[in-house]
């Protein structure tokens, strides 16, 4: 009664070892293990004692951080981690208008054209390799500023008086969002970085480069 699905397992030996540990470990030990990790995962959000213990070990002992971030910074980071694209819509509305995106897209298009000319003029590259390089360049996807399609958070319930519950519901929503993609075509319009992130990345698997709006603002650009 279980449907079989082919998946890619990057490290099969992990599951072989895990199966052995799973079978050899008694149920009470697994229960205690899961209880600990559940509390540990949310310790930074619970009472003051647990917040301090969590910080003392993970931040001070392991990373040498001496002081906790102020409450406002924790609040912003928490909201950003859960509702990143909602905040991103606000950010680009105030800081990155459509004309700024169009200007950057034109700049990147010109860079891609330049790459095409450079490939054609490479003396050491064979005609076959040039053809393959041009085909890859033709399929290259630049993503500028912000997504053309924003994430839909309408099924995620957020309560102002339930911080831990918000995180749990976000985990459930995120899991449902991921599993809904199984067996579906890859959504190449999806972003894996928010517009307000000061960073950029190249994804070789998808042959795409991503420049969030924040990295295209002074003093970075």
Q: Across the structure, where does each feature detected by a protein language model lie?
A:
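Short amphipathic alpha-helical coiled-coil/interface segments
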Residues: 104-119, 133-144
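Amphipathic alpha-helical coiled-coil segments
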Residues: 121, 144-152
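Active-site-adjacent "gating/activation" loops or surface patches in catalytic cores
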Residues: 161-221
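Noncatalytic, helix-rich "gating/capping" subdomain that lines the substrate-entry/channel surface
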Residues: 1-106, 110
């Amino acid at each position: 009664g279980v449907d079989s699905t082919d998946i890619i397992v990057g490290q099969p030996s992990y599951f072989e070892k895990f199966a052995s540990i799973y079978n050899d470990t008694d149920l009470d030990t697994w229960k205690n293990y899961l209880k600990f990790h559940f509390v540990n995962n949310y310790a930074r959000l619970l009472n003051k004692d647990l917040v301090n213990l969590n910080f003392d070990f993970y931040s001070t002992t392991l990373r040498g951080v001496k002081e906790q971030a102020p409450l406002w910074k924790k609040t912003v980071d928490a909201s950003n981690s859960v509702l990143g694209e909602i905040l991103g819509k606000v950010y680009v509305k105030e800081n990155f208008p459509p004309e700024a995106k169009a200007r950057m897209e034109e700049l990147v298009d010109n860079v891609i054209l330049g790459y095409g000319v450079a490939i054609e003029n490479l003396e050491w590259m064979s005609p076959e390799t040039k053809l393959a390089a041009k085909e890859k360049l033709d399929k290259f996807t630049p993503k500028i500023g912000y997504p053309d399609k924003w994430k839909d958070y309408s099924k995620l319930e957020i309560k102002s008086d339930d911080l831990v519950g918000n995180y749990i519901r976000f985990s459930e929503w995120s899991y449902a969002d991921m599993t809904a993609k199984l067996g579906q075509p890859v959504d190449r319009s999806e972003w894996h970085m928010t517009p307000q992130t000061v960073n950029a990345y190249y994804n070789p698997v998808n042959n795409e480069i991503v420049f969030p709006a924040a990295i295209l603002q002074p003093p970075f650009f």
